[in-house]
Amino acid sequence: MELTLHEARVIGCLLEKEITTPEQYPLSLNSLTLACNQKTSREPVLELSETQVQIAVDSLNRKRLISEQSGFGSRVVKYKHRFCNTEFSELQLSAAALAIVCLLLLRGPQTPGELRTRSNRLHEFKDVIEVEDCIRQLMNREKPFLKQLPREAGRRESRYVELFSAASSQLETAQPESASHTVAHVAVSLDAEPLELTKRVTELEQQVAELTQKLDELIASLS
């Protein structure tokens, strides 16, 4: 399967809410939209309309990754995932693997350390080693679910990305451009730094002179 950004966000939210707030699951379109647009625990932060979420839901429904549920006496349609661990799902994941996949769908590429820190509401990992073991299991499949990204400069750990969405291919194509942009930005910053410092020193000297003058005037008025 290859999910779009919006589809991945919808699936990630349904996986998350099923675990963290089971009393509110399945989710209505309004609740699902709010979950997709959360300002915390989401990367990137999105501002999807209900129409955009509905389009993603309809697409996932056609892919048989979501099902609709209507309560007795209620006209509100609610949605639940069929992504994994249901009688209709080919994909069966352990609680640990589900937590990792869910976090990667919601927050993009992350290191094992980040995954352990952020997973406490989804699954309690004993340590980073347990996270790394689970990552290896998800990678060492006939059809891998995750892959390791090249280690970035300044990072001690490599990041991992899920392979259910188009995110990994987009990252690969974006990395060279991003790297060159970073180098250019650093070069410009280094060239501009002396000029900025000189300007700042001049401004501070002027402020000190003005304060000194005001202080002298105040002393003179009091004497």
UniProtKB/Swiss-Prot annotation:
> Residue span of the signal peptide, if any?
none
Taxonomically, the superkingdom here is Bacteria
Q: Which Pfam families match?
A: DUF480
What InterPro entries does the annotation carry? DUF480 (IPR007432), WH-like_DNA-bd_sf (IPR036388), WH_DNA-bd_sf (IPR036390)
Which family does the record claim for this protein?
A: Belongs to the UPF0502 family.
Q: Which PANTHER family does this one have?
A: UPF0502 PROTEIN YCEH
The name under which this protein is listed is UPF0502 protein Shew185_1758
Which organism was this protein described from? Shewanella baltica (strain OS185)
